[in-house]
């Protein structure tokens, strides 16, 4: 089926209207452009823009980024790969050494084990090369759809929609979808967002979620999307 290029918004206070996802992304970028004290690029975007654009480094960065601040993720990724230059070295690393390097990041015990396991599987099953198919990525321990989709987008430039808490929250607030979890949000976004926007959607939504559409006390007055935002409308009522 051909992807729809327009999205029907579910605003409870206005008649349904059609709006291009391009308009939403452009309004987000405009708000971010004129925002003060803007945080830097997301950790994954920074890794993508590095000269080597190493898929393995992006995979490990994605694993480390779960429930971690981007600035901390970037710092830990750099520190980890200063010691272990490639997948083979990490596959042979002592888990306790990995823990000592990433201990300042959330869930470092679990993540250290995951990094070691993932590295060994990539060496033994995929000949040291990070797979570029979602089915193969999902076989890796601790790798779910969000992580797999992030690797596809940021490492291989393959169209996918990584849905994290920011993408899920914003999509529901502005009425693009009406879903209860990230899995359903991804399913709905795939249906209604033109594939040509899949590569950029995550990075823009995440930046917006980190800086403007915060989970608590969002900066609604700065937002160019408040006219279609159910959250903002409900806040005004109260």
Which residues make up each language-model segment?
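N-terminal polyanion-binding entry modules of DNA glycosylases/AP lyases
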Residues: 1-132, 196-197, 204-238
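Generic solvent-exposed, charged/amphipathic alpha-helical segments
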Residues: 25-29, 168, 190
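Catalytic DNA-binding helix-loop module of base-excision-repair DNA glycosylases/AP lyases
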Residues: 59-64, 115-123, 130-175, 185-188, ...
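Amphipathic alpha-helical protein-protein interaction surfaces
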Residues: 69, 143, 156, 160, ...
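A general structural motif at alpha-helix termini
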Residues: 91-94, 102, 141, 152-155, ...
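Short, charged hinge/linker segments at domain and secondary-structure junctions
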Residues: 165, 180-183, 224
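Short basic/hydrophobic patches in alpha-helices and adjacent helix-turn junctions
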Residues: 172-176, 191-195, 207-211
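Pocket-forming structural segment of enzyme catalytic cores
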Residues: 179-197
